[in-house]
Amino acid sequence: MHKQTHKRAFYTLAGCIAALALCVAASLFLLTPTPKAQDVTIPGTRGDIYATVQLPGKLARGEELPLVVLCHGFTGSRSGDGHFAPLAADLAAQGIATVRLDFPGCGNSIEPFTAYTLSNMTDDVESAITYMQQTYGTGRTALVGHSMGGRLASLYPQRRGGITALALWSPANGAGLRGMEFLNIDDFSAVEALAAEAEASGSISTWGVDVSGTLFTEMRDSDPNAALRESALPTLLTYTGHEGILSDTTQAETIAAVESLPDGRAVLEPFAEGNHNYLSEDAATAAALDKALRETTVAFLVEYLK
């Protein structure tokens, strides 16, 4: 009888210790600080790519490390208009790594802006994914793209594959050359004239940069919404209420394309007061836009990457 009592006491104590150990381990995981973002240089097909990596805190043993690549827009940078760093921190808190890079001629890139083409940016995204896989062992991968970065993200799965989900912020997804409508939203014939001159002479100066004829040609030959339908990936789409540089037709066609997907969703209402860059002159509105953009994007990516 005493032996049975001692045995029960032993197992009870052992169970309590095990439960306590699990609680301590869970607490330590929650308290593990997210590592600071790290600027890195990624080997690319044309030279170095300047990027920033954000890793999560300690992962459970054997848990796969998901990855999100953040793609900025035309003449932008890896800051993503101030949205990318806080988004990366939020994703890290959910156990998701990110890499955000400067595309050719943008940010810290030492290439001329004429190297800013869809094919070069596609190569750079692929190089960034390969770097993250080889350096950190990342697995399932999603793309977040804003504006022209959203067009790139829409096209990438069809061209290279290996993508689990897409989050598109105000993508410039007009079919063909309509994707460049932002250069002169009031007069598309002026955009066509720019394209003709750039393709004839090699480049054209507009928006304060030299845009290559190759970019115009690649835009003319691409249809991102058709690519979305073909890839049929889980896709989040957002547009604001004051896009300004994207036509109603582009927005309507892209919304229809995404909503036709099995796991496509368009979220518009939280961004009704924002401009194309999800900003506002009113500080409180700008903060609310950023918060809604991050929360919407993180929830979607966690659903499909974790």
Regions found by a protein language model. Name each.
Residues A88-I110:
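Conserved alpha/beta-hydrolase
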Residues I49, R151, G161-Y304:
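The alpha/beta-hydrolase serine catalytic core
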Residues L65, H72-S77:
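Active-site glycine-rich loops that stabilize anionic/oxyanionic intermediates
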